[in-house]
Regions:
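N-terminal secretory-pathway/extracellular module detecting exported/lumenal segments
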Residues: 1-47, 51-105
Length: 105
């Protein structure tokens, strides 16, 4: 895994599936939850557009799973709003995307 949050969630990404287009990096990530969410999900995958030049990201697709590591029944799928987000300083998301940018520039 790449990093772990304070509450024990682990974040991964598939290095061999990273794609670059212009200044953007596109990647599939996975979050493995320490304990199931209130909805019963144990993990989720996400497809993200990452702009390392000004450090922002846009989630393009999310898929939620009943079991750990993206296994089991899909409980929900979604396409988030088409807007950029900026990771909170010191957050696990900031650490995760910093690592992705470092490894793929």
């Amino acid at each position: 895994y790449v990093t772990k949050s304070v509450d024990g969630h682990k974040f991964y990404y598939e290095k061999d599936r990273v794609r670059k287009s212009g200044k953007y990096i596109y990647l599939w990530g996975l979050t493995d939850l320490l304990k199931p969410s209130p909805y019963g999900d144990s993990s989720y995958t996400f497809y993200t557009q990452l702009d390392c030049s000004i450090f922002r990201f846009k989630d393009l697709k999310s898929i939620y799973y009943k079991k750990s590591m993206g296994e089991g029944e899909i409980t929900a799928e979604g396409t988030p709003k088409d807007e950029w987000s900026y990771p909170k300083p010191g957050s696990v998301i900031e650490k995760f995307y910093n690592k992705v940018c470092e490894e793929n520039q």
